[in-house]
Amino acid sequence: MNGKLLLVSLMVTMLVMQPAEAGVWDWLKKTAKNVWNSDIVKQLKGKAINAAKNYVAEKIGATPSVAGQIPFDEFMDILHYRP
């Protein structure tokens, strides 16, 4: 009897919580999308991309435009080469 009662209570709890959790996940997804597309985050992404380009240019000794034309395997070899 206790097992059946526990099973029924768990099923009712799942049926009640599923819409609530769906609402939380929808809110979280909407908030994350708004944050990701905000002006501040766009500026930070731009700064991070520029920093990465400058790092690559410094590491391989080339300009960022030249570094973008190097094949991926060669690029990885250059990054891992330590004289």
Swiss-Prot record:
Location within or outside the cell: Secreted; Target cell membrane
Propeptide residues per the UniProt entry: 66-83
Disulfide bridges in this chain: none
A Gene Ontology BP annotation from the UniProt entry: monoatomic ion transport
Keywords of this entry: Antibiotic, Antimicrobial, Fungicide, Ion transport, Membrane, Secreted, Signal, Target cell membrane, Target membrane, Transmembrane, Transport
Tissue: Expressed by the venom gland.
Gene Ontology CC annotations of this record: extracellular region; membrane; other organism cell membrane
Taxonomic superkingdom: Eukaryota
Signal peptide: 1-22
InterPro entries given in the database record: Antimicrobial_7
Pfam families reported for this sequence: Antimicrobial_7
Chief place where the protein resides: secreted
Keyword Membrane recorded: yes
The family this protein is said to belong to: Belongs to the non-disulfide-bridged peptide (NDBP) superfamily. Long chain multifunctional peptide (group 2) family.
Role noted for this protein: Amphipathic peptide with potent activities against both Gram-positive and Gram-negative bacteria. Is the most active against the two Gram-positive Bacillus megaterium and Micrococcus luteus (MIC=4.0 uM for both). It has relatively low hemolytic activity against human erythrocytes.
Name used for this protein in its record: Heterin-1
Natural source organism: Heterometrus spinifer
